[in-house]
Amino acid sequence: MTTQNFLAEIGTEELPPKALKKLATAFAENMELELNQAGLAFESVQWFAAPRRLAVKVLALATSQPSKEIEKRGPAVSAAFDAEGKPTKAAEGWARGCGISVEQAERVATDKGEWLVHRATIEGQPTKNLLKDMVANALAKLPIPKPMRWADKTVQFIRPVHTVTMLLGDELIEGEILGVESARTLRGHRFLGEREFQISHADQYPALLKEKGSVVADFNDRKALILAKSQEKATALGGVADIEDDLLDEVTSLVEYPNVLAAKFEERFLAVPAEALVYTMKGDQKYFPIYDKDGKLLPHFIFVSNINPDDPSKIIEGNEKVVRPRLTDAEFFFKTDLKQRLEDQLPRLETVLFQQQLGTLRDKTARIEQLAGEIAKQIGADEVKAKRAGLLSKCDLMTNMVFEFTDTQGVMGMHYARHDGEDEEVAVALNEQYMPRFAGDELPKSLVASAVALADKFDTLTGIFGIGQQPKGSADPFALRRAALGALRIIVEKNLPLDLAEIVKKSSALFGDKLTNANVVEDVVEFMLGRFRAWYQDEGIAVDVIQAVLARRPTKPSDFDARVRAVSHFRALEAAEALAAANKRVSNILAKVEGELPANIDTTLCAEAAEKVLAEQVIALQAELAPLFAKGEYQVALDRLAALREPVDTFFDNVMVNAENPQLRQNRLAILNNLRNLFLQVADISLLQ
């Protein structure tokens, strides 16, 4: 089998930096799918992405499809010919579909009779004849939310396309894609290297592009270079660069030939909280801040230029000039905000709606204040501090700093509260109320902050569900899924003794007559329990384990978690499968019983040895496990219940449950009812697969 490397590059206007990597990886994945569907062998698919190009390179691609042997079975011989031996219409129709006559068909004998069959060899097509359509299909499936048209073309893409290059080895694959004919022309850097040049062989990519066009097409190479040089620059300045991966990806997507440089700003700006300075450096300017070994911000930053002059001083000065007004703004906002106490912003919250039916932000802070106090009492936090933090929780939203730099909400509240002389736990809670902000984010550290964070999240959940605006489909404008999961994480990971139903009930009472959904408590609890499913599935816990616990609907998250861990452990035991099947059988038997199920076991009515053994063990375990269930030690309890496998199997092998004697029958049903209830103290294990 002969192979060649294949290159496909699409040259465009500047692509959206936050989407570049996703587009490139999707292009490669789509191309792999096309190749596999065509039955073409290849070694691997590499992807390349720069601000003005997307490319894939298929290594060791077979130059033709393999031949395929096909076999199409037709009607049975008995149905293919009539009494006179002439082909029936069914046989003729099948043969016509195969492109043959009935006489050309072969016959195959099976244990079900003799059948007509058509066997043929389909020759594979040359790969070069297939590639243009494959590339077009791969591009058409890219995740582009808002494609655009340009010039007088009718085609659409994420940005205007200027060049298309497709090479199989040294052969140009001709054809039009996105309104542009495939050619050997590559475009280089806008300001460095050659503007246009020719590529003669796929193997020259991407080295030729770097050599002649001053473009590093490999995204990961650019990213690694930026990271290494940034760390090197920061070390030279006696610090450590703050390089988040998302920002690094974005910066990598903005430059074709990265030149990493360091610049500085005036030390006077360090009097402003570092978070505000970092917000504008990272968010607006795409700079990397530098911290000293103690985590304090240094008056330096790192930026990445797309040009590489002999003297970079002008570029450095230019970036310093660009950032200075933004830092000056932050300084001004900070000094202006300090002229008022945080508490003085409370009246202004009355001018901002939280939600039309639910009132203003001032209404929300009043509810958070009360609910945070209630939660604090239950979890052992300082109630006074929790209520104070709840009262001040949204005041920083009215400050100049947060109005201009929105991502500093919370953290600026903390700084302003400290300046006002508020208790440190209160100040920190103003920042930590929003935690966790995203999946995997850290949780509030103190119990006071946890109380405020939970109060804020439950207020939003209860309010929005209370007016019937719960999430539908993928739409979630109030981020209720994130709020629910965040609340669950705080309760579970901090092992807080809170009941979802109780908190939602208290929260709903604080809304007065604003809520219109009479089932708000049940709806919010159901929604939050549903979030558990997503959480545990992400952890790799089996769906049937989660369903087994959900069937019992425990509303204390810490208790729910303990049950899931216990059932997951139990599921791996040797006895689990048999006991799950037995519980399913017990459930089916008891479901057919009319009226109230018998509750009390009478061992004197046990006529068979097997039922007496099981009855005695069930009674003994009820007494033994009651304190374990009360303490939530479910794993230990299930380990003990696993010992019932043998007596349960023996019972079903030797005892007729539905005995003719009504006393025997009722007693046997009581044994099974009590057996099932032991397991139901943890979960419905009959749902385990």
Swiss-Prot record:
Which superkingdom heads the taxonomic lineage of this protein's source? Bacteria
Q: Which PROSITE patterns match?
A: AA_TRNA_LIGASE_II_GLYAB
| Compartments (UniProt record) | Cytoplasm
**Alphabetically ordered keywords of this record:** Aminoacyl-tRNA synthetase, ATP-binding, Cytoplasm, Ligase, Nucleotide-binding, Protein biosynthesis
- Protein name per its UniProtKB record: Glycine--tRNA ligase beta subunit
GO cellular component, alphabetical, reads: cytosol
Q: What does the similarity note say?
A: Belongs to the class-II aminoacyl-tRNA synthetase family.
Picking any one GO biological process from the record gives: glycyl-tRNA aminoacylation
Transmembrane portions of the chain: none
Q: What is the lineage of its organism?
A: Bacteria, Pseudomonadati, Pseudomonadota, Gammaproteobacteria, Pasteurellales
Question: What's the main place this protein lives?
Answer: cytoplasm
Listed NCBIfam families: glyS (TIGR00211)
Q: How does it assemble?
A: Tetramer of two alpha and two beta subunits.
Which species?
A: Pasteurella multocida (strain Pm70)
Looking up InterPro entries in the UniProt record yields: DALR_anticod-bd, Gly-tRNA-synth_bsu, Gly-tRNA-synth_heterodimer
Q: Which GO terms describe its molecular function?
A: arginine-tRNA ligase activity; ATP binding; glycine-tRNA ligase activity
Q: Catalytic activity, per the record?
A: tRNA(Gly) + glycine + ATP = glycyl-tRNA(Gly) + AMP + diphosphate
